[in-house]
Amino acid sequence: MKIIVTNHAEERAKERLGWNKHAIKRMAERAYETGISHYDTDGKLMKYFDKLFLVEHQANNVRIYGQVVYLFSNNRLVTLFIIPKNIEKYIKNNNMFHVKQKED
């Protein structure tokens, strides 16, 4: 699926991660296709996803890929940010994290 990167998402990726346009597009496509989704989570990580959906009303698809949270509205990347430190351990303990890492 073709991913559209909004201006806001592009600015945030440059500011927070130092990525250029090409890197943003490439990573957004990877996150959309193979990132950890709400469906793949449980426990504390699921609660974190639920909170993101409540706070970010535009987003209907949240993905975690690597150490970054991507918020999509359909096929548009709305914004992205680095995973908070207190959530990292739940991602590494999540079974889908290990399955998806082996696939890559």
Where are the model-predicted features located?
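Ribonuclease/tRNase effector modules and their secretory precursors
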Residues: M1-D104
